[in-house]
Structure formats: C-alpha cells, structure tokens
C-alpha cells in the first residue's frame, strides 16, 4: 500500500505541501512539493560506493520543465521536450550552488538530483519550489548532507520587503532576490535590483534568511517522521606522517612560488614543485598513493595562501586587500560594429560588442510561465585560449549561460524602456583573458560598448568580485579577486552597480559563520572598488554618444489609426511586402497602430513614411485624383487612386455619351482623372471620370498602384 507522509505549512502568502512515500520509491529519496498549484517532483539517487580513483564530487542537478504542467503540448517538430532551455539551466545552477558546499570534503560518491515541474501556477515561479524540494529530498535520503536548506525569493514593493512575491508583484518590484541557507548561515544569493543601496540589499538577504527558517523546521519535521537512516560514511583518516613530510619538502617552496605575480609563470613553478615533491616521496616509498600526495599538496597550497592573507601580508600578486588591479579601458575598438569596448583588469580581459536591431530581432520565448519577448540579449563566451588551454568550442556550457545571465542582470536596470528606445539590443562578451571575475569585466565592458553604440543607458555600471578568507579568530575581505583567491577562499561575492546603487548581487559562500558584519564590510568595500572602476571608465567615455552608429538601423516611429492597419498590411500581407521592397526598409506594425520603420538610409525612411501616409490618408468626397486603371469589367473599371485604395468608375460615369464597351475608352494602366462621388459605410469608393473631366486640372497627383487591400 502507498502511505504518503505529508507536511503542510504556510509560507508567506502561499501554502506549501511536502509529500513523500507515494512515488519513485526505488530512488534514494523522493518528494513532491507544491506551492499554490505549482508542483515540483524531486528525486535524489546516491551511489553507495565511490568509483575507484574518483578525485572530485560528482554531483549532478537536473531541473526540467514539462509543458503538460501548464496544460500545453510542446511546439517542436517532435512534440516533446528537448534539450534544456536557458531558464532550466539557470535553475539547475540555482539549486546546485547552495547544496554542493553542504557535502563533506572527501565525499566522492555520485549523487544526482532531478527536479521535474509537473504543475504550474503562472503566479508562482517553480524555482523556489524546486529548491525546497531538493533540500527536502537530500535531507530524507540519509546521505551525508549537512542540511536542510531553506530558499526564499524577496521583492521590494512600496519600500517594504515582500516574501515570495507573485509574478504580477515581481513586475512592479525594485528587487528580485533569491536567498538560500541553513539554519545558521546564508549560503547563496542571486539577485537583480533597480539601483538599491547596500543597506537595502543586505536587509533583503537577512529578511529572506529569517523568513525561510519555517521551511527548514518543516523539512526537519518530515525527516523525523519519514527520513532514511543516516549513511555510515566517514572521511578517510589523514596520513599525518605523510602530511608532515610534504610540509617539510614543499611549504617554503610553495610560499616562494606564490610570490610570482604573473599567472602562467606561477602555475608552471607550482606544477614543478608538486611534481618534484611527489617524485621524491614515491622514490622514498613506492607504496604511497600518488592521489593522496596530490590531495595533501593541494591542502598545503591552500594553507600557504590563506595564512599569508590572514597575517596581513601582500596577496599573491603583491596587492593589499582592497587594491584593484591595473585597468585599461578602450572604446570603439572594432570599426564596423555598432558599439565596442575592450576592458582589461589585470590578467582578465573582455572584448564586448553591442548590436542594435529592430523588434523583429527580439527573442520570443515560449516559457512554462507564459510567452514573453526579450529585446535585450546578453551572451557570454569563454573560449579555452582565455586561460591558455586547448578545448572544445561549441554550444555554451552551464557556466557560460550563468555568467551571461549575471552580467545581464548587472546592466538591465539602466537599459532604456522600449517606448523611448525601440531597438532590440544584443551584447556579446568575448573573454579573451581570464584570471578572476570575467563576469564582472563583462558588466564593465557592456556598459562601455552600450555607450559607444549610443544606447541611452541611465548610468554607467561596473562590477567587482570580492573574496573572503576566514579562520576562527579573523577574517579578511579581498577586492578584485584572482582565480586562485576565488578557488582557495571562503566566499565569492560579486556586486554590480552604478554610482547610485546596486543592480546585481551574487554570493556563493563555502563555510558557515558568515555574519551580517562580514557581509556589510564586503558590500562597503565593493562600493569603493566599484566607484574607482567607474572613475576610470568615465575617462574613456563619460556618457552615451549623441547618436547611434552610422551602421545601425535608424528606427522612425509614426502612428496610424487602428482601422487603417489592414490597409497598410494588405491582403495576405501584399501591401506591406510591396512597401518593404519598394522603399528598402523594414516595417513593423503593432496592434495599437504604432508603425516602426527601420532603415540605415534616412531618405529611404522618409519615402516609406510618405507612402504609408498616402495609404492611410482619408479619401475626400468631391476631390479629384489622378488615378490608374487596374481592372476592366463589363460594368465599368476599377481605378487606383493612391495608397492602395481603389474605386469603381461605373460605365455610366466614363463619358457624357452612352458607352457600349468600356475598352473603347479605357485601357489597363491608363492614367485618368477621377472625382470621388461617394465612400459608403463599407469603405467602397464610387468614382466618376465624366464629372472629373468637367473640372480643370486634377487636384491630386498620381501614385503608383499598390496591391489590393483587404
């Protein structure tokens, strides 16, 4: 019999239900989590034995959305879900980041977490639900997991923090922050903000962590009732004699190597020391394990770097704790791009371009939460040559997608609104060198490239990566961390913003005990670094250029009456296609009658505007037009009088005398003056050549006949 065990609780404005014991009973653990009709099914499978020689922790997190959750069938050719979307990849990373540091060092058994969205309420984003589910499933599994964790989304509306805002509330919020942590510590923060202060951001982190304690309490209650026995796993005992011998052989040499400021030279020297130490030890005792020697050397390397920083000595590259590496800022480096910049900070460098397009270039996203159009695209590329390596080049990996999204968050708050700047904008960051904080270099480069392209951003933005080294008695916050400091430190803390406030904040914390005081120090130190970088950037370009690039399309906007839209489009799009070909422009019409004409040539745009005005002009009864015969029928002739409008000249209105045969008087393509006699309620136009002939010269010039309108 199926005996589900259920835990239900109120979480802000939502009711959360945790259920286990019903499904996937062969998995190590499985939980169905629902939050107001958004339901995510999360499973955990852990292998009891580690693979021989496994040198890292093989944790895999897969988050997948099923279209049936929203009552839809996939729109792909095969009518089934395919490769993960960018959103699914980002949510997988969001789940992975806070749970990974909670597994003990030395645990290398394979673990897979799969979160499947099976029902979705468009007002409740599944990402928080999936994070809660992953935490609950891991806590139930018996794996050596030092959780559970809680997760919360925090908004900022009307100067108040809002717990887990709905999708509608989030559209009005100045903040979208996700925070995850254990009972006593914040582990992960991911956010974007509309220029909020350091205190407001820190307050949101603390608020979210306080509120999510109810999640942790309820997961613990579920584990008490349904949890599996804890795995009897213990880390392998450290060979103290070997560790002492390695310290004696390598400590002073590693300390000297970490005074070499150039990255490649330092890496080469460290590799030599490790190789020589390992060879010497194996020569002394062939029974020693090379992998164990490697692990102990890595631990020694970490201790050498950390202890120097904690003693207040200069960092690896000789800087003090709050110093920024040397900056080199250049704009307009690529002649034919719409905007470009080369941003260099020490050994980290980004070549960033900005490209302007029309609304047609925007990305249409058919997501589980509904369809949306994205007119600001940010793509981050990390080729292997940037770190002096060879490797595969192809589709973006999870890391590239995640870094691109973080950089996009850093710039999004200063981008102009669509009605003020009707362009689709694509920013691409090519990381050409990397030694720490390439995503924040991308933010700086993007700001520069956008200004170089003439995009009227509200303010310049810059990003900085902070680090932390902490022991029981002391802590040091580092500005502008190197790759080694990120790897060997206790926290990776990235902040982007303008002079006015923060636009993006990302935190990944590897240890417990990060207090509010430490986060406050890091945020304040990051502000000083950000302002320093902005000062250097402003020397290269102080604001957006006065005009967009000569190579970018210029978009001209006009307004037409809604009931004239069909005239401009024409039957089956015939009129708008003809206009596009005739004028050499791109024309887009919105439902409210807004017409956007894009052209690289101003004269072509003016011609297109004139033609649209002709098509949409009202026909005046009694006015004489110069028209062109487009069709001849037994009872008269149809004459185009401009702008795709056509009227009928009845056979009785061709001449003063009786007309037996229309073709005796009119030929196809013949230009004739016509007078408008009537426009009926259905828009049909009655014309007369006979009455026009009694007048003097035609009052309206002929225009080329356009395809028939609907």
Swiss-Prot record:
Catalysed reactions, semicolon-separated: RNA(n+1) + phosphate = RNA(n) + a ribonucleoside 5'-diphosphate
Keywords: Cytoplasm, Magnesium, Metal-binding, Nucleotidyltransferase, RNA-binding, Transferase
Cofactor section: Mg(2+)
Compositional bias of kind Low complexity: 694-710
Coiled coil: none
Stored SUPFAM superfamilies: Eukaryotic type KH-domain (KH-domain type I) (SSF54791), Nucleic acid-binding proteins (SSF50249), Polynucleotide phosphorylase/guanosine pentaphosphate synthase (PNPase/GPSI), domain 3 (SSF46915), Ribonuclease PH domain 2-like (SSF55666), Ribosomal protein S5 domain 2-like (SSF54211)
Any Pfam family: KH_1
Amino acids binding Mg(2+): 486, 492
GO MF entries: 3'-5'-RNA exonuclease activity; magnesium ion binding; polyribonucleotide nucleotidyltransferase activity; RNA binding
Assembly: Component of the RNA degradosome, which is a multiprotein complex involved in RNA processing and mRNA degradation.
Entry protein name: Polyribonucleotide nucleotidyltransferase
Organism: Erwinia tasmaniensis (strain DSM 17950 / CFBP 7177 / CIP 109463 / NCPPB 4357 / Et1/99)
Gene name linked to the record: pnp
